[in-house]
């Protein structure tokens, strides 16, 4: 009975994750996943708090994955139960949980080791904390200690494999964004067993460096942290045009990741070659960013040559679809805003804490707002109409929810276009920044392709 409940619950969460929460989920190079029954330790980068374990959990088909996550997220009882139900285990860290808490790691690591020896999959984040940017931090070697000590318990007869994995997001915080999980070629620890018997620390360092290099090769790692904000803004604005020059659709996350890596590498080269010129460019881009954020503009509006007739056409579409939007708002307006109080709290905390926003939104939606409000809709339909209509409405709720989300997004886009179309003709400030953006793009084109 417990197994049936787990299967149903996990598949329910998979639907919420892959269909409702994310627009697209990309799982790349699945052929690198070792065959079922082979002990596999997944090592992944960690940038998005609770979303990273969820992304891994739903990337291995029906295989159960035991995942280590920071222990402090288990302090809330309801969240702890949710995480345990998904085989997510607490990993204690001295700098966060205190030295006394580390004793708990032995119990958890032993349990994970047994799962490995039985041919299971265990996942861990070697950075030991989530980053708040596209950057790969330092790796702890604790996961390798666990892997080799587990192999030693079986007299090194089990070949444990490390599967380097990269996780990447189009947007850390927004629903209906994209997520990507990419697997590298696994590393067989058996080839290190003999050397480990005499020089364990040497082996840990060698394997750790190899795992980190493999993950670094797959992910977007912006190493110039002093200029991170400028580089990240450039890849999200100029980077769209850069992708198109490479013949890539920037709306395709795997392809955009590749062009972002090329762009960021080129920016690093230019900084080494022309530090003063790049410092000026970064400064100007940050000023452009400040203007767009202040005016609540998206970068794409600068490239939109909208005429009045096109705006009228868009307005007509919005008006015609308004009744359906109003109908679709029930109950989705409550689902969309249910997590707001909690997410605002994490946003105000800033730093790595803001990376909990997406995970909190997912947990609140999956465990509370979606099942409660969807069931409420079904009951109300059943009372006032009939069973057939209630079932049809229930089955259409996810489609209506997506429609409500994209209608709202289309409306915001329409209002932004109206504002920009109005201001660009009357505001010298808008004209200045439109011209400045064009000059910056031309400058980067010249530098990057020279």
Located regions from the model:
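Low-complexity, intrinsically disordered regions enriched in charged/polar residues
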Residues: 7, 201, 205, 228, ...
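Extended catalytic-interface subdomain
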Residues: 148, 163-173, 180-185, 194-195, ...
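Amphipathic, soluble alpha/beta structural segments
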Residues: 203, 207, 234-251, 304-328
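Membrane-proximal, non-transmembrane alpha-helical segments
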Residues: 265-346, 357
